[in-house]
Amino acid sequence: MKHRIYNKAMYQFDSPEDSLWEATPGNRSAISQKLLGDQISDIAIIGGGYTGLSTAYHLAKKYNITSSVIDAGHIGWGASGRNGGFCSMGGTAESINTLIKKYGLEDVKKYYQCQIEAIELVRKIIIDEDIDINIQGKAEIEVARSSRDHEVLASYARFRQDVLGLKTNIISRDDFAENYFDSTEQFGAISVEPTFGIHPLRYAIGLADAASKKGVKLYTNSEILSWNKTPKGHILKTSQGSILAKNVVFATNGFMPEHLLSSFYSRSLPIISSIITTRPLRQSELDDHNWKTDDPIINSRKLVNYFRMLPDKRFLFGGRGSSAGDMNGARKNYMYLEKIMKKIWPHWKNVEIEYKWHGFVCFTSRLTPSIGRLDNDPSILFGFGYHGNGVNTSTWTGYQLAKIIGECDKSNQYPDDMPNMVRGISEKFPLSSLRRYYLQFMIRMYRLRDSLEMSSK
């Protein structure tokens, strides 16, 4: 595990995360098996999450091209089965103004139009494939934790609507308290459409099932130990088998085994994100904070929290965490999240937390997704770096990778509708061995700024 950024506890591929999602997975009907013996496939996809499954699904559906998906764990073992279930706009950690300076207004507008299309793509797959998911909400809410934050958010909402053409709404503090919820950190909000919440693991399993029915082979609990290029093609070896493929799609995102190929070394920065969920809340407890919304929500803290009320009235609350990925660090992250949650909603201070889990979100050095072919080997494709908005962005990325394979020649040609800001591989992070440490420093600084801002409110 020397090649991994975090503690080995983050990479226990044979152990499911102890999450609410794993406890309620629905019907696991997709046919999968370990990779045994020597197999052959035109296209091998490393990663059984949304990116890899979407690539395989769209290759089969749109181009009648079959492929093989290989994952070190089970389907949805990584971020695809651990996230908060926000199907919302984002995919970048860069400010819109900076994006416009770098790529131009038209490309940024194209990107956000693609984000809307990505959300609707997820909705279409869920409906078309009859995936057992209760879609919740219609907008993402960003709630202000101070009156100053509300002014900033309102200006941001007007910009996104007037310049980017997004559907936004500005909500006053009183309106929000009456129609959404009330708390100690509620000074109004903004909303942006479309957005909805899902059961993320059920979506991954449903996507795998749909791909499997179209002829995609699913190999699970099959960690790739080596990757070599030969005149016959790429050979991916596991402990009990191998697969020979003409093309490889690298779709592992935050759990990227970057040691397998030097071209991917230090291209990503995985960041721990932790989630806690309560027991189902009683109606009287919901009334204590006048909770009325099922929209996915984030707050305006520097170290953003994300939260939503689930269909069974459990409350999900998440945020970024600073640790080495060991169990002691995880416990500290969960305790910190619970402390913040119960500070914001004090009437819930005695509500029990029933599930706690964590995983990775994936950043790139340019703070936008990284999608395409390797310049030095166009038979290798990749898609990663969704910055905490992977449900829709990774599904769309898989669709784009399928189009590259199905429609573009083996050069650097990209689909016309793919924005420039996501094309090609991102630059390497500097001082790669120190990535986790300067990340920890950044998170501590953000937490300090959040505390100072609240004390001066």
Protein language model regions, located:
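N-terminal Rossmann-like FAD-binding beta1-loop-alpha1 element of flavoenzymes
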Residues: 41-69
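Active-site substrate-recognition segment that forms the wall
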Residues: 85, 120, 128-136, 224-226, ...
